[in-house]
């Protein structure tokens, strides 16, 4: 008998039962293709995929699952919870990894590194979807249409929470009901209903902060997961090894780098009970109350284990006991030590402390058994800044010209908080521009959705925002550097080239220095006569390199209090390291670093020199920090500063020769209307011995001479016209001065040459050239 082979594909028990009912199962040989399922290890989602119900796997895995880009898959956690996603290819992960965001991870109760099962699934088109916000909102039909557009083709299931991007933030909507009631996806014919009454916040198990909300900090995230997440999720591993998990972690670093965010994300990812303690809130003037509060916090944590106690600004409640005069602080520290030693069920309660002053914390807390690990949270590098900008712009409508790579390069020294503020400020600029362009009336109750869709943030908005957001690390020492380019400095080509090599090259071509095996120069000393452009060169270096710029005026460092001057130097270098790449510019360095042993003061300058030597060539390396110093008295500088390893480059800034004087005059007269009889070459030849500052003064004086001539003419005309009427005279002379065009003539320059004299004599020039030769011999 001939047996027909019927090829049937099915994904549920329904097909099986139908075959039995038709009594075909016994008569027909069935080849059933069950939906293929594969196990994957969970990794973080890309920023662009957060909240979009996208799962990314390798192309090889997609072929194994028999899915194409955009198909729907079911992701099943270890305890059977499942979620839907659209599958997309990833080219930067292995075949056993899957990228899913915090919303999907939370709904199926898995964390980074856990295993999930993935299979292709059938999803029905939705006829109706009912949503509810998690907080009270006002909305109109245009918002409903916007939500529908956002959710188009996205797979949905009852009970899940969806983040809807709203300008710089998100609004969470919960899926209350769907028709049909199984897995569905939104189509053009789907009826979207949004209820006004919000669902209860407590009923939601979705994260407010996930790992994807933290740009950068990959190393810190990995360390903190090893210390906290592994013991809480898999205590049996530590029991097998016969070791106790850590009790505490101290996160330290500058303000705004993400310490608090890191702790919150950790608690959300592992589903731990989270208690936030702000250090100063613990303190009380009543005897024993501060200690009682701490005991209650630890008791609450143990009752709700697994839990995390996060103590922000821990230095406020646990300072060094020998440094404080109050008894309250000492008792609080003692209580904290006792409670951390007495934590039961290690690995179930973790204490995380955060501070930007780790040295101020009592040493007894900083030993194994209390704060077992200390993790430094550093300001982000260029790649980290780009990651952070991606986090803060992922829900922002931006134009195609927004270049996050360029913005990351321009924001040296910016912390995560600074970059968040930058994104918000750019959005405000865009809003202001949009309102002006569209002439919107903000008093009207609603703005049409089609107009709102045109609102986008441009690169120009970010550049404008950069002007008002300063890096917080340098706020105390930040200097707004005037925009000075190399072209604004006439002559000095050799000096400019040396500065480019020492400062710009290491920042622009770091790989070149890595390959060569040499370290860039640490320090550059510019010396020469006054007025030759030393400070101007430092400004140009800061502008052209794009590095952060700290200007230190020598005399400002000096203090009558013992140790204050050295502390000021230490703080400057500490901030420079944190905000690297940084240029520290010491103007008039001879005032704070003279030859030791010769000064008659109380020894403050000697201590400053010692501190400078230690900072420039000490144990702590100067990574991407360049020191530029300027002086016109190199003969009185301490010799120890002038050796290689401190000031590696000693650059003589000479007075300009004739060619350089011509270039300087061209720079200073580029916006000055010159008469045809003016020859800058002739003026440059006559200005022998003039420095750059002298030539600037010469041009200024010549211009004022021309203005004097205009004033004399206008004064005569006004007096003749107004005949003693003072009100008429003031009005007439103002109009005359503002309307009359003028040009600076050769005669004006001749008069100026008689007024502005050269500040350098031949003897001065010879003396500085002698200094230059002596210094070169000294360092040779």
From Swiss-Prot:
Keyword entries, A-Z: ATP-binding, Nucleotide-binding, Repeat
Cross-referenced Pfam families: AAA, AAA_lid_3, CDC48_2, CDC48_N, Vps4_C
Residues that, per the record, bind ATP: 253-260, 528-535
Gene3D superfamilies: 1.10.8.60, 2.40.40.20, 3.10.330.10, P-loop containing nucleotide triphosphate hydrolases
Molecular function GO labels: ATP binding; ATP hydrolysis activity
Domain of life: Archaea
Membership in a protein family: Belongs to the AAA ATPase family. CDC48 subfamily.
Described function: Not yet known, shows ATPase activity.
Name of the featured protein: Protein SAV
Organism, scientific name: Sulfolobus acidocaldarius (strain ATCC 33909 / DSM 639 / JCM 8929 / NBRC 15157 / NCIMB 11770)
High-level lineage: Archaea, Thermoproteota, Thermoprotei, Sulfolobales, Sulfolobaceae
Chain's gene name: sav
